């Protein structure tokens, strides 16, 4: 990330992970808007539907993380921002309350996640412009859909915890 940010003179970026198939472009835009208002180091979306938003990161803060980290395994990099006390952390602002759900899993890690996404995407005429609100509305109307994969959420969270390491110099 740092190499790309430096090469293209980027001051701030929002990540969108490849396994978050329904990452919400509107939420990503909110991350950019918030940075331009506040210039914080790190923006997170605690409590948002899993897979709808990841993080907004300032290049200046990322450079500092790269200087202090003592590991090349940084897949679970957020702890370098949130647990070191070195950075200004903000929660994503101006988000619809509908997007705050802890009972929906929108990330692709297991076979049943694929089945979940397949069901979601085939439920809409235009699956290429879905918002988190659209998905939540569908799942409210058809709650059995979220049961396809939500049982995997605790296993996934534990796996994330097991892979998270904070190693500083």
Give the role of each language-model region.
Residues 1-4:
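Glycine-rich, basic loop-to-helix element that forms the pyrophosphate-binding segment
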């Amino acid at each position: 990330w740092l190499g790309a940010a430096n090469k293209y003179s980027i001051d701030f970026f929002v990540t969108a992970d490849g396994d978050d198939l329904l990452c919400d472009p509107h939420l990503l835009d909110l991350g950019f808007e918030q940075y331009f208002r506040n210039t914080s180091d790190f923006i997170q979306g605690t409590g948002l539907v899993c897979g709808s938003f990841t993080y907004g990161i300032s290049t200046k803060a990322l450079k500092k993380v790269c200087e202090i980290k003592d590991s090349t395994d940084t897949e679970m990099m957020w702890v370098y921002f949130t647990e070191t006390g070195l950075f200004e952390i903000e929660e994503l602002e101006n988000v619809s309350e509908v997007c705050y759900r802890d009972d929906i899993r929108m990330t692709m890690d297991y076979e049943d996640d694929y089945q979940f996404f397949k069901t979601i995407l085939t439920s809409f005429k235009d699956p290429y412009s879905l918002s988190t609100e659209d998905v939540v509305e569908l799942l409210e109307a058809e709650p059995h859909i979220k049961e396809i994969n939500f049982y995997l959420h605790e296993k996934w969270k534990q796996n994330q915890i097991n892979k998270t390491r904070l190693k500083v110099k």
